[in-house]
Amino acid sequence: MSELEWDGRLDGDDEYCYRPETTLIVLADTIAKKHGLDPALVCALCEVESAWMPWAARYESGYKWLYIYEFDDEGYPYINLSAGKRERGQQYIKFLIQLGCSGQTEVIHQKISWGLMQIMGATARERGFRGWLTELCDPQVNLEWGCKHLRWMLDHANDYGIEMIGSSPGAFGQHTPPAHTAYQRFDPNLVDLAAAWNGGKVRIVDGKYVNEDYVKRVRKAMEGYQ
């Protein structure tokens, strides 16, 4: 039985709107609290990122921050067979063949954002997930690792600080380099976390988040779970 149920409404250009069953919201609430996170934020991220669809997946071909680890007895035998790793990785190829998968499969799966929270496969690997990345479509697995990463971002916020980019002619992204970039320590709030979840870190240009529209959507969604 599906964890989601269509509520019969259409939103915008024939986009289906789904209403999460109570079980998903309760699960998100429970796991968020386990990691010391605000359940409203986690639920809002699920709503904005995937519309509460556990099977949601998006391939991001331009994503470059892949996580590489080698085979050991406690993990699955994956390796990113990039040019620099091919020679040293030959001993692992037989394991990949036996499983019917390839290094390229792992690369592609790391570039996919998965499930309710749309956590990147590479990010889940970095946080310690060693299962099949397709398991991230399981609601409990997804929420566990999504919340684990969100908690990590909160705990390590000041390792990289908040990026402040000064004004410069033209729209953001059309000037290289920015007129001024500064990093400062900060006390992250829920809105900062939402911005970082979407953009990898908190980036502010001329007083606004670079992903301001996304942040506004999350903030509005949070109101429905408080």
Briefly describe each language-model feature range.
Residues E3-Q226:
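Catalytic glycan-binding domains that act on GlcNAc-containing polysaccharides
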